[in-house]
């Protein structure tokens, strides 16, 4: 909550993953981590988790920042007045008030990551590791009933995405519009 030096620069750096195309980042991961313990040719799951996390970091940061902005500073000051440590104030006052924002941000991050195409297409190279988007693509290319199965998986993905966004809206209520305002 305190203003730190170069806070605007830090905020801009957190938003960089939104500005870079996912396919560029995915190719960068492949080039960087091939022949290491995170080799996407062997097992892309750790690298997919890292890629999804980095690409969705701005949503989570904005969600947490919105929750902190909506929490009154006077609550922290009152806690300090009564002798509570910063950790106790964080654990007993701030976290319960910001928790809804964190859950909603997590739901949005999960929903967007679940249907991410660029990272999945590039990083998942073996069919046993395909995320849903790459599986949809692979099924769509199959002859016969592959298109129908791909369409069904796409509908399931859209239903899960809708449920996550509705869940985030229900958790945040009228605060949903505040989620992505500039910190």
Question: Residue ranges of each PLM-predicted region?
Answer:
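Membrane-embedded alpha-helices of multi-pass transport/permease systems
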Residues: 27, 47, 54-76, 114, ...
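Helix-loop interface residues and adjacent transmembrane-helix termini in multi-pass membrane transporters
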Residues: 1-3, 42, 113-114, 144
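C-terminal transmembrane helix and the adjacent membrane-cytosol boundary/short C-terminal tail
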Residues: 4, 65-76, 80, 84-92, ...
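Membrane-interfacial helix termini and adjacent extracytoplasmic/periplasmic loops
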Residues: 2-10, 23-55, 87, 123-128
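Hydrophobic transmembrane alpha-helices
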Residues: 13-22, 47-58, 110-114, 125-129, ...
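Interhelical loop and adjacent transmembrane-helix boundary motif
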Residues: 114, 120-163, 167
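Transmembrane alpha-helices
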Residues: 16, 20, 54, 61-64, ...
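Hydrophobic core positions of alpha-helical segments in small-molecule transporters
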Residues: 13, 50, 90-95, 104, ...
């Amino acid at each position: 909550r305190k203003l730190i030096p170069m806070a605007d620069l830090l905020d801009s750096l957190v938003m960089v993953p939104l500005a870079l195309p996912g396919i560029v980042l995915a190719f960068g991961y492949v080039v960087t981590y091939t022949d290491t313990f995170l080799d996407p040719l062997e097992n892309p799951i750790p690298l997919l988790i890292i890629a999804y996390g980095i690409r969705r970091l701005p949503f989570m940061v904005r969600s947490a920042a919105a929750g902190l902005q909506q929490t009154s500073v006077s609550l922290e000051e009152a806690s300090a007045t009564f002798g509570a440590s910063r950790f106790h104030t964080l654990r007993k006052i701030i976290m319960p008030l910001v928790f809804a924002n964190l859950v909603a941000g997590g739901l949005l991050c999960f929903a967007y990551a679940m249907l991410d195409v660029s990272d999945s297409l590039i990083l998942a190279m073996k069919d046993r590791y395909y995320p849903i988007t790459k599986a949809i693509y692979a099924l769509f290319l199959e002859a016969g009933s592959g298109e129908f199965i791909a369409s069904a998986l796409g509908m399931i993905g859209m239903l899960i995405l809708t449920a996550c966004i509705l869940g985030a809206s229900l958790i945040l209520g009228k605060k949903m519009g505040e989620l992505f305002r500039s910190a």
